[in-house]
Amino acid sequence: MALTDSLTGVFNRRYVSAHLPRLMERSWESQKPVAILMFDIDHFKTVNDTYGHGVGDEVLREVANRTNRNLRNFDLVARYGGEEFIVVMPDTDRDAAYAVAERLRRRVGEETFAVSTQAAEITVTISIGVAVVDGVGDTADAILKRADDALYQAKRSGRNRTVASGVAEAPVG
């Protein structure tokens, strides 16, 4: 059974489902937080509709690469489905996770993506939800739901934003 996404080379949803509960248990035992970043590419359907699915695939691969380049080597990156990704960050509190999410959001949006099949470059942005395991008894489903809820708050607030679960939204910048 594959644990990596064949398109992007990062872990897949199955891997996260299998390993997140273990990481959470270690977090409780060590009393160190685990942060979850859940993000997706804003208006990704437009990329596919305008440039084709091949270009969409290139964008997904490059977003995965940029994500990996902006994280520590022990953070876990996974494609959760479609254009949605998850980052699991052990030993990371809410403030540190928010700072990493903002850096990632800015870096993805600042660099253009070269379109190999056309003489064009495109820019994409991402919206990010942040949640932190905040106590013994939290479940993987609960932390993922908090991250997902924060992600959708970021999207409802105009996209290209980071929102932390349980924290008032900070201005983009």
Predicted regions and their residues:
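Catalytic-core segments of nucleotide cyclases and related cyclic-nucleotide turnover enzymes
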Residues: 90, 98-101, 131-173
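Signal-transducing coiled-coil linker helices
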Residues: 1-7, 14-26, 33, 75-76, ...
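Conserved nucleotide-binding and Mg2+-coordinating catalytic segments in signaling enzymes
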Residues: 1-18, 39-53, 61
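Short helix/loop segment flanking the catalytic signature motif in cyclic-nucleotide metabolism enzymes
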Residues: 59, 72, 86-106, 143
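Alpha-helical scaffold within the catalytic cores of cyclic-nucleotide enzymes
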Residues: 64-65, 96-114, 148
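Hydrophobic framework residues that shape the active-site pocket
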Residues: 44, 63, 77-80, 85, ...
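Catalytic core regions of nucleotide second-messenger enzymes
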Residues: 79, 108-126
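Active-site-proximal structural segments of metal-dependent nucleotidyl cyclase/transferase enzymes
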Residues: 19-51, 67, 78, 97
